[in-house]
């Protein structure tokens, strides 16, 4: 039974109402500093911890709760007579409920004007110590670190005569240990990111020790293959617009491959300003297009490779309306992603309950890092978020691209970034015409892209081509020109750039160098 609570919070969301409810249930309130003042100003009967321990706060508040009368009351096991006798001998009442959240260290170091001294002062000591004590003794003590749990605790207390059950206490304790681990991880990341100058402004993006924190969203039926187990975890600092923010409206449970492919589709479609559709198969775009609306964009994207689109993942950057839904519903699709679905569109898919509909709000946030596991280690890099500006483009051929060719080239370049290397993409009129992905030689990717267009009945005459990396020889260029391309965009940087440019002039096509490579593995 909860008779006495200690409350000390930095995030004061909902704390007055929670404390009032506790007081109404007859719980004695202990508190510190600003929290105690807030509760007292609200007319609640509260005892300052300094008055409770008989020892004043000291060292500018660094020492407030580090006292045997606090930790003894938290750590004592109620089932051990010797523990209870020790409390009685020293006049220490039990503390049955601890409500604590910590100094805002992460928010502090996120500020541009934060100094090392600011960061150090926002490293909480007493808070984590109390939290860990209470979480360790969770059989007897209820500990709350998240304001979202106030209502849960109150409801259980009201239903059980001020008692909280073991299952809830255990869940809350595990939440505490996760929270303090993340807190210490953030401190370690920060301190080990400082350079020799020990200045906040000169932090390295890659700390000497990297701590990552993720919460499990769900266990998955299996991994990439049925014999592999898997789970999906969400970054605690999920950026706006990221896949992990999805809301599933209908359909079967997402699989490992569904999630991986959905991320590829969503990241690609978000980059377009015009209404766009991206169709993904095995993490590669097999159709990308922009159009007047979602239905138009889908119709164009589907034309690229109808065979590969079967059972694919489809993403839109505009609402899916009834027209788009009816067009998509004619095909077998695993997952459909959009910022929103009209009521009429939802009705269309109501008859296809296996189709997974994911709603994700658009946003321009990105993960801080791109991560890849290797045997015994982790590769960490910044995101491939470089967008080439028009002023950075360099026409290196005698013939300049026309305005239409320039539009097609920029579209193709945007798509090529999301195709597995080696990547060759034919485009025209705001749609992909042929995609060659994941080949060990660039010339083979060029041939495959050409064959794909031919199989789909699409002409490549007058098309634009993007290559994610330079042409090492002229052979790849010769293939795309023979297929009908009249302009090419590529990074450049090959030892044989001069030969490739000369070949482009020989074919009387336009070529643009971006100076930026987009390998994707």
From Swiss-Prot:
Its EC number is 2.1.2.3, 3.5.4.10. CDD domains: IMPCH (cd01421). SMART domains: AICARFT_IMPCHas (SM00798), MGS (SM00851). GO terms for molecular function: IMP cyclohydrolase activity; phosphoribosylaminoimidazolecarboxamide formyltransferase activity. Residues 1-145 form the MGS-like domain. Coiled coil: none annotated. This is Bifunctional purine biosynthesis protein PurH.
